[in-house]
Every structure is written in C-alpha cells, then in structure tokens.
C-alpha cells in the first residue's frame, strides 16, 4: 500500500497544480458500463477506480464499484456530487462507501432495466469483512429508476431510509431486504430516519415535509419555502441559483430548463440568427464548447452523429448536418489490388447504399453467369440496382458483360464522376465492349471523366453516342482519348428515329427522351429538359436560376399574370399566403419564440402584418394595448367600488343558484338511475317451455341483444374465455349499468351458441347470496355471459393487497360463504370445475360470491381436454381424478375448495410454486400435499387435508364444510393465529378495519359511465352497520412460536409428507422427556403397514370449543371393492358424524349469530372468557369433557374400537393462560408399537379451566398428547405417541396371508389383492380409485 499512498500524494499534487481549473469548474469524468465483469485482481480494480474518479465531481455515466478489497482507501470518491447513470456496488469487502457529497443520481441509464442504485452481496463468507454502512447522507434525489439493496449481511440502516422521499418516480420499484439484522438504532435526533447511528447520519427529507403548495422539494415546511421548479435534490432558497442540483441543466450556477439556443430571433431583421452566447448540453451542464472528442448535434454534445447526418467542419467546429439523402458511404471496388476480380453474386450485397467506389468496377461474364469453378452462382440482374446510389468511381468502369434484357446502363444514372486514378489495360477509364443488346449508354448524370481513355466497341445495337460532345465530359487534353468503333452506324440509328430529343442542346444525349440530354436547349427541371418554367401559371410557381427551374417558397401566394417570387427565400415573395413578419412570409406570427432578452410575442393586424405585443404581455395578445394581453384580467376603468361590489355579489348569487339547480338535477337523475338499475338487476323473466306439458321456470337471466352490451376494456382471460368490463344499456333507456361480460368461444369452430340451451337457463335460474348471479346471456357465434360488475375484484387480489388488514374472523367467514355458495350449486346439480380464489369475487369486504360456475359445460367435450402446456389450465387446483380421467363431480370441487382455502390462509400464495404443471400429478400421487399455512392450527389444516383425499367418497361435502367453518368462525382466535408485526416506532394495535363504508362508496362509483350507485340511507334502506361491526371486531392475536414451521418450504409452496425419520426422532425425544419442539410432517403414504396417514386422520378434526380429551387414531389398511364405495358405508357415516356433531350454542337467546349476508359473528360467551381471547381452548368442566360410560357407548368412531375406561382424576387448574396453546397432530411418528399393543395407556388431558356452564355434548380432539414434564415447556406441547404398554385400544392384529389366518377372525368383504410390483403405477388404470395394493401380500385388514 505504500505505492498506493505515493500515487495518491502525486495525484493530489497534480490536482493542486491545476488550481483554478478544478476550483472554477466541475471536474467531469467518464463512467463505465462493465456491470459485474472486471479485469484483473482487486488491486488492479482499485487502481482503475482511482484513475477514473480521483477528484471527480460529476460522473458522466455509471459509477460501478465491484470486487474491491477490504483494505482499499476509497476516500477519493468523496468529491462526487452527481452521477448521470446508475450506481452499482457489488461483491466488495470494504466497510464504508464514502460518498458523503453525492446528491443526485439521474438514472439516464439504469441497471437491470429498472434500478438506479444496485447494492448486493457485499460481504466475504470466509471472513468478517463486509460493507457495513453507505455514507450517502446528502443523497436526496433519484430522477429515474428504483433502488435494489439485498443480501448484504452486515449492511445496516437501509430499512430506516424513506426511499420515497428520494425516488422521484412513484412507480419505481424499491427492494430493500435481507441485509444486516443486529444494527444499532438511529440517534434520537434523527426521528427514525438515518444512514447510520450517529447524530450526523440523519436523512435529509426534502419532499415529505413540504407544504402542499410546493411542487417538488423545499427547504422548510412553510408555503414560502418551496424550491425552484428546476431544482433537484433540495435547495437553500427559492431562487434557481439556490439549488443543490439541477433537474435539467446547470448554466453557470443557475438551473435552467434548456441551455442558451444557437439561434435567437432578431427583432430588427425578423430572422433567427446565430446566438453569440450559445452553449451546448454536455450531460447536465451547459458548456461553451464541446470536448475535443465530441461533435455538435444541434444543441448537444454527442460522441457520434446519428445515421441520417454526417460530420462536417464549419469554422473549426465539428458539427452534424443532414445528409440530404443518403449519407456518404465509401465501398471497396473490384479488379487489381482488390479481393474480387468482378462483380458477382458473392459480393453484390456489399455495394448497398454505396455512394463512392474506392477503386474500380468490373462486370465480366464469369460474374453475371456464375463461376462453377469457384462455386459462385449466377447474378440476379435485379440486384444491379444497388448501383443507383453510386455517384463517384475513383478508378475505372469496365463493362464487358450485361444482362440481355437490360438495354442501357441506367443503374448508373446518378454517376457523376469517373476519377481514372487506376486505368484498365492500355489506360482506359471507361470501357464498354461486346454488349450485344445495349441500345443506349444511359449515363444521364455523368459530368466528368477526370483521366484515362474511353473505349466503346463491338456494341452492335448502341446508338446516341454519335451525338455526344465528349469535350464537355473529359477533363484535360482530349486528343487520342476516344476509341469508339464497331457500334451501330449513325444512319441506321437515324433511320429508326433513335436520335436526341428536340429539347436537348447541341451537346448531344445519352439516350432517348428529354431526361437523357447532356444539356438543355431551354430550361431544366430536376434533370429533365422543359420548354419553360411555371412563372405565371402551373403548380408550383417557379423562378429560374441558370436555366434551371426552382419552386417558390411555400408561404408565397400564387399570383396570376405576374411572377410569384424572384428567389427561393421567404423574403422574395410578391405576396404572402398567410402573414408577413417584416419582409418574410410566415405561417403564423411569432408566439414565444426565444429572443435575445426573452420570448417574443406578436399579433397579426388587419393587413396580416405581424405587430409586437405590449411588453408586459407574457402569454400572447390580440392587440397592441395592455388590455389586449391573453391570460390577464382586464382593468375596469371608471367603475365605482359600489358598482364593482354589487356586480360581484350578483355574480355570486347567480353562481350559487346555478350550482343549486345543477345539484338538484344531478340528485334527481342519480335517484332515477339507481331505481332503474335496481329494477333491471332484480327483475327476472319467465321463459315459456317448448313442451306445453312442462311448467314454466322462473329464469332470472335475460336474453340480451348485442346492441344492448358495450365492452370497455379487458379485465382478464382464462381457460374458457375472456372477461370484459362493460355496460348494459337497456333498450329504450338512457342508463348505463356496469356489468362484466364473459365471452365464451368454441376454439374448434364446431359449435355456435345461437340457441338457448337448458343448461344456459339452469345457470340463469340460480340465485344465492354467495354466488354471482347471471344477469343474462347473449347468444351468437360466441356466447356472452353477463353478470353484475363487482369493483372490489377477486378475492385473490384482495388478500394479497390487504394481508396486513385481514383478521381470523374475516378469513373464516369467507370460508363459510364459499362453502355455502358451492353447497347451493351442489343442490342444483351444478359442478363448478374451476373453483379458485381468483374466481371468487367480493361484493363487499365481508361478503364474497363464487363466480364462473357452469361455464365448462357450455363447451363441447373436446374443448375440455387438459393440456399441461396450457399455462391457464388450473392443474394445481384440480383433483387427481379430474387431471387423469377428466372426471368432474361435486367432490372434485371439494378438492378445489381445499386449495382455495389454502390460498386464503397463505394470503394469496401460489400453490406448488416453482413446479411445472406436468409435475403436479406425480407429486400428488406420491402423497405430497400443500404445506400447513403459518396462521392455521391443526384443526383448520386437517379440514384441508380431508378435502385432498384421493378417494373422492371420503371427502367432506360442502354442507359439512359450511357447518365446520361456521363453528370455527364463532371462536376465530382459537383456529387462526395471525401475528401482527410492528415496525420501528409503531406499536401493535387492534385488528385493522379494512375498507371503510366511505371507501366502499367511492369504489362503487364509475365516473367513466357517469353513474353513481350510492344513495342516501332513506333511498337504499340498507344498513351499513353490519359491515362496520364485522370489520371492527376486536380479535386478540397470538404471538407464539410455531415449532413446525421449519418444515415449511416457502419457495415451493408445498410440504413433503413422507419424512418418517423426523417423526421417529421426535418420538424419541418425547419419550426421553425432552420438551423441545419437533417438526411434524404430514404424509399420506408410504406409512407403516400400508396405511395412509390421511386415512388415519379422517374425522379427527377438533369440532368444538370444549374438545379436550384426545383420541389416538389407529391407522389401518382397507381393501376396497372394484366398484365405487357407496356414500353410506360405515367409514363415511363415521366421518359425517364427526363433522356434523352439533355445537351447543353458548350465546344468550335472542342474539343473532349471522347477519343478513351470512356473516358469522364470534360467540359472545366465548369472547367473554379470557381463554378465548387468548386463542386457547375454552374452559369447560372436567366432567363435561370426560363424559359418562353410557355416553361413550353411544359414540361411534372411525377405524377404531374404543373400550370403556374410568375417568382419570381432575387435572390441576393452570396457573396462567400461558400454559394453554395450540397443539399439532402427530401423524409422522412411528405407529408400529401402538398397532401391535395389547395394553392400554391412560390419556392425559391438557390442564383446563373448569366451567360449569359448558354442556357435556362436546367432540374430542384427535391428538396424541402427553402431560408436560417438569422442565420449561414451549407454547406448544410435544405430542408423541403413547408407549405401547399404555395404549388404551383393542388389540389390532396384522392380517396374515393364506394359511396363516387367525381362526377367530372373519371378514365378509375381504378380497386379497396381488402384491406390489416395481412396475406398478398408482394411475395405471381407473380401478385405482377403488382398490389399493398392499406392500405385503400377507397384510391383514384391521
């Protein structure tokens, strides 16, 4: 580092030697564009940074600091005040980035397409070296782009910065995450906003503290402390010279919107003239001259001219000027010294857009006809047109072969010069020979052959060359330079009329017509000879200069009988077409044209002459006086103060009357529209039956005409069609009703929707509070289904946007309402097929409705085929039988319902995120299911798991799901645990209220439809107190650690459910007395003895607030018959019994548990108990929990036979509510001991709080739970299986194979299946759903 110190000292001395240059102007340095790519090691990278940015103030480009070591001294960066591009800091090891003076990052270039500041991976995994602090204390403006700061293990105080005060673009993305954790707090004077822990590290706020009158930054909170509009990054005063940085350009310390222009308006000459004080834009600075390696393009300094301009030198200034056509392009020719000997198909494309040929052009027979020896194909004659752009050939032109159908060389019609710097053979610069079909030369623009001889011979059809005066073309002596022979004789050409046009002069011509003349006899216009110009008539009017016709200026008025102009300028017109400004004809008078002292404004008088406005007019005028100024208040002269006051009062009265009348008219129209909307939305139509014997159905839907519907915009698209937002304009009405229009098309084209089918009428007859009612349908080539427009959108978007404002009460009620809506569809025989959170809409924040039901049945069967390649196919929501066999039933909808509830409980997470659609069925076959959401207890999660059972017959029905979620919704904190995270300085408060009634009214307004859907309370007769109370229920939340969260995979969205080892280790730790929480995976199979864990968990969901006594579920294998199992078998009834167990109402009589929209209220009795508020189990009497022997005999359980046993003694009352908590079901531990046990163990109930008011009809929790040990326990009890010696269940013996059966065991329905083979697949045939292969051939049914 001594060498580095020496270099820094030398650099400092050099900077001091520059003296005033550094002090009086900004030190500008170039940036880099390397990204994360670097050359050399860290030492080389440091030296490069030092050379680029030492004493630099403005970085013209990007500031990239990558792979710099921990001992690098970066103090030389402290002078940087502005970066025009982006700032990249990545993979460094230094502790502090010293940019204390950086104020503005302009973001003219952004990293990764969207970030102006990108800071990432600044740490060393093998040491403690890492970036710990960004010293950007003066940064107050990012003009374009966002911020990305991630994965910096030691970087602190990034989340204490108000980035919205710095970033100008409100839509810019700001990502700040995964940085330092153990950081000191901000100093108290910083008020929570700082770059570091010291008092000098406070963030400077320049936007959020400003008064509303300020458009941008400010230097104080008062209205008179706003910064100038051209300021960026703050200011110290209101002037444009007080800015810390400029928004656009800095002109000698003043911030201006543009630099002084190169042309200004001269009021004396009425012309734009060069500005002696012009400056050019160089980055964000106005400079008097561009750097030597830049060129001037209009008002800017650029590195190179754009494609349509060329670089020229004017008075020592390099400038870009328009090319006036093709820009000059030089191309290499053919012949000696070149890579090519002739023009052929291999090099013809290299002459595109060439204006100058450096060398020669040879056209030989091997080029046109091809060269088989070199495998060069024949040349396409049409490609010879590329030479239309050639103006000069520096060498010679040699044409010895030409396409037979081309009779001239008009492809060289723009050729003006043949240089002759290199000559062919005996000194020829133009050689044309043996072209048998050529009749004329066609070199109409050729003016000069600088050197060399001309050889034209053996062209049997060539004429017109006899007339040429070659002395006008050849430069220098002409003696012995012409060798023209053996062409067509002159007399033959004259005899056939192949002579020059009469308009040609005596100089001759290159071919027929007035456009081939070497010179004209009279006038020429655009290279064509004419008899006269359009002096007095014709369009456009012209003047002549050196016998060539030119058009007058467009602003000249065409004259009759006299000349319109005498030159090309606007000051040469005899009369102006529009206005005259001084001597010049203009299209309009100057309006805001920049002059030497500011903008110039003029107005036209009666003669259309432009006259200057009054000097105080700033926005134009219509006359010369002050009162003629535009945008200014007229001064009333001669009016008394009394008259003025009366006029003002009268005007105010008229205005108020007009406003009052307008309001009353608007209110009347509003009420009228509201009533009309209700009439149309609530009224149905009766469809007459086709068969007179049938009874007419009340169909709520209408049959629309296409003229009544108007689509406004596309809301989205799905598997079966596209959804539009639109309006319904009833025929004969003027109201516009907002609706959703779903367009369904048959992609195969085999079906049209001209006829109204029974299924369409069935959909239209459905009406329920929790389904979106079909307003009508419009048949045609594509079917249009019309529903009411719900502006709150889908439930999926709502939970994602308001996840911090959703409580357990609302989530569980949504589950109830979706289940009720689906149960209504089930009662009416309607299978949804596409149930998901995106297809559930919000009518209000407390009421949801199921949408898009019955759509799939409108399409032909082939259109319902599922393709994994289709991204819109809802594979992740579909049941396995639907994926594999296309089987859709109400029970397949139950599977989708479970996924939908999972979406709600994860606040809109994507199921199976990161998996391709084709991988999902294989994953489900292996027994994997979606992971338990963090907010769900095992009760809620097991309801989801039951919805995902492979056998559709043992899934719950929607009626049972509605009852189950209704029961949970009466005590929400018991089943959902939502943690409220508090930010810095924010205390945790009660559950947010969501959208207020006022916001709901604003959401329902449709300004583009001129429609207001809200009326006063006496018009609506709808109370809004229900919604308010539902959203403002004070629900307690639990902040408890969850021991099972280590198994969740947030990246993938599902939980692996076959981790048997975890369960075994958990059991071992439980037996050994450890209270440490173990993860408990949920696996459907494989499990011991061929039993599915999902089967063993059927019916084992906690069903009431008083469930305390646990039942250990014994899993067993069940062989099924080949036919589908009826819904009335024992297992099914046992499951239904557990789900339909009535809940004893605890609320006082007379209190409603649901509102008019089906919103379930929390049980007031439960909410009155402390345990309920804390989310623990309800306190009940012990006798109520244990029950009596008679009650035990009447209870029926699934997959187990329970013996009667005596009630254990009363447990002690817990000392505090902290001893109570949620418990997870242990389904991952080894069950082999319990399955083979013949003894019983007493079940130890969790300590409870007695409550004499609880009824004894309570369900049970199916959990394996042990009494806590003496050590400190966690919030969740460790639930391991009971030892084999203590199981309280009957002996369950394994089924032996043939010849090994126990004599006393008989099974009437037992059918032995074949053993499992390696080639078997779970879905080889549809019979899989009604049978199962056991791992062992001698497995016994239990």
From Swiss-Prot:
One of its GO terms (molecular function) is neuregulin binding. Residues 1097-1110 have a biased composition (Basic and acidic residues). It is an enzyme of class 2 (transferase). PROSITE patterns: PROTEIN_KINASE_DOM (PS50011). Its EC number is 2.7.10.1. Monomer and homodimer. Heterodimer with each of the other ERBB receptors (Potential). Interacts with CSPG5, PA2G4, GRB7, MYOC and MUC1. Found in a ternary complex with NRG1 and ITGAV:ITGB3 or ITGA6:ITGB4. The cytoplasmic part of the receptor may interact with the SH2 or SH3 domains of many signal-transducing proteins. This is Receptor tyrosine-protein kinase erbB-3. The gene is ERBB3.
